[in-house]
C-alpha cells in the first residue's frame, strides 16, 4: 500500500511540474513558475539585456527577468513595475503603464475618447499624436500627415511611402510654381516657394502671408497667433528672447508656477524655479515647481519607463540622444525610427520660436 502511495505521489509531482512549465495564455513563453517565482537563466530585460523591456507590460526584476510577482515588481524592479490598469488621483496619481494610454476621469487606462477626452487625468495630449487604422482611423491635428506606423508629423517618414492620411496637405512648398498654394499655419511663402517664418521667407521676395509672423507696435499692434509671445523686435515665438525682456504681448506664454497663477506646463513638461516650461535638468531639477518627475525613470523611480518610447539614461533621465540611449541605459535603449510625439511638438514649437539673427541682436 505504501509503495502504491509513493507511486501516486511521484506521478502527481511529475504532472504538477509539467503544468507549471506550460505557457500562460496571453504571456507566451512564460510558464506559471516563471511568472510567479521568476525565470532562471540569462537576463531577458534591463541593464544586462541592453535595456530591453518586457512584453505585455510585465515587470523586469532586479535580476533581469520578466514576471508579475513581488519579486519582479517590488524592490529593485527595473522597468514597468506597475502592472495594473488603474491610475489617477485615487491610485497615488499613477500614470498608465502603456506609454500612449490616457487616464480617464474614473481612473482607468485606455485610448478612447472616454479616456482621453473630458475629465482625462493624465497623458491626455499624447494620444493626439497617434492616427490611422490602429487608432480608429483618426486623422492628425493641424493637417499633419499620418505615417505608416500611425504617428503624426511632417517628415518624409510621415508624408511619404505608406502615409495613411493627409499626405499632401502639409506640403512645405507654396507660391506661383505650386498652384499659388499658401503655407499652413500662416507661415510665409518665400521667393523660392518654401514655407517658413524667418526674414529669408517673410522678407524681400515673399509671395504670401508675409506679415503673419510679425507683431507689435510696428505692425499695427498685431498680436501673435496661438497666443505666442511678441518679441521686442516684432517676431512671434515662445523662447525667452520672445517672452522675456522687451516682450510686447502674450508674454506669459510658456510660463508657469507661483508667479503665474500656479499654472502647470502643457504636455507634462516641468516648471523650472524661474517659471519656464521644459524637460531638461534646468527645468526638472533643483527648484522645479511642478511635474518634476515626469521625465525621471529607472530603478530610483519605481522602474518607470519613459514616455513616448524615450531612453532611460544611467542617471534616470529620459531622452533620445546617445547620452541617454547608450552606455548605462536602463530601458527602451534603441531609438525609434520615427520622431516621438514630444519631439514633434517641440519641433513645431522650435519652428514657431525661430528668430532672425539680426532681429535678436
From Swiss-Prot:
Mark which residues the record calls propeptide. Answer: 27-41, 337-361
MF (Gene Ontology): carbohydrate binding; chitin binding
Residues glycosylated per entry = 137, 180
The GO annotation for biological process reads: positive regulation of cell division; positive regulation of mitotic nuclear division
Cysteine pairs bridged by disulfides in the record: 45-60, 54-66, 59-73, 77-81, 87-103, 96-109, 102-116, 120-124, 131-146, 140-152, 145-159, 163-167, 174-189, 183-195, 188-202, 206-210, 215-230, 224-236, 229-243, 247-251, 256-271, 265-277, 270-284, 288-292, 297-312, 306-318, 311-325, 329-333
Q: What keywords is this UniProt entry annotated with?
A: Chitin-binding, Disulfide bond, Glycoprotein, Lectin, Mitogen, Repeat, Signal
This chain belongs to which protein, by name? Lectin-B
